[in-house]
């Protein structure tokens, strides 16, 4: 398994990963569609790292400036998305992608790396906490998903002291 920088031509594959991994248990975002463009708006290939098993992309992490274009916040990077195809889950790929995101954020001069995760997504929370992230805030009942209110949890990692 190797991790590399995404290329523009990875977009369709990354979109398929989003479709395959989407669940309201892990994201309040609308259901992604196969024909949506992955690299659009604020998502740039230089902000995405992909995990390859052989010649197949099996997961990705999107790590980008939290406040793109805002000088006062340029020291903060954010994990905006993490996804691993279901057959490849449980093999340490997510962990390796998070570690790569930490390295990328640090190499960009980041002092902090943050992310948000649903309070109900215990698997992801445990992964991030194993990587050194700590809870920095909770927005109780932030989303109504599947008929229940779910917290949005802000996690952070100090890139200077680790």
Outline where the language-model segments fall:
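Short glycine/proline-centered loop/turn elements that form peptide/ligand docking sites
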Residues: 94, 98, 120-124, 141-146
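Terminal substrate-recognition subdomain of acyl/acetyltransferases
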Residues: 148-162
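Conserved catalytic-core motifs of GNAT/GCN5-like acyltransferases
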Residues: 114-117, 129, 134-150
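Acetyl-CoA-dependent GNAT
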Residues: 5-11, 15-87, 98-100, 104, ...
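Glycine-rich acetyl-CoA-binding "A-motif" of GNAT/NAT acetyltransferases
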Residues: 56-59, 123, 149
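Active-site acidic-Proline motif in GNAT/NAT acetyltransferases
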Residues: 85-87, 91, 119-120
């Amino acid at each position: 398994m190797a991790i590399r920088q995404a290329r523009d031509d990875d977009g369709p594959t990354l979109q398929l990963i989003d479709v395959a991994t989407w669940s309201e248990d892990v994201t309040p975002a609308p259901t992604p569609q196969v024909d949506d463009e992955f690299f659009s708006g604020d998502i740039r290939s230089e902000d995405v790292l992909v995990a390859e098993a052989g010649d197949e992309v099996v997961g990705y992490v999107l790590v980008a400036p939290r406040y793109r274009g805002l000088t006062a916040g340029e020291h903060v990077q954010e994990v905006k998305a993490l996804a691993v195809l279901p057959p490849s889950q449980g093999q340490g790929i997510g962990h390796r992608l998070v570690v790569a995101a930490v390295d990328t954020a640090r190499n960009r001069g980041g002092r902090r790396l943050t992310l948000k995760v649903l309070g109900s997504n215990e698997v992801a929370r445990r992964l991030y906490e194993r990587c050194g992230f700590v809870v920095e805030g909770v927005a109780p009942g932030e989303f109504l998903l599947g008929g229940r209110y779910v917290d949005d949890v802000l996690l952070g990692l100090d890139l200077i002291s680790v």
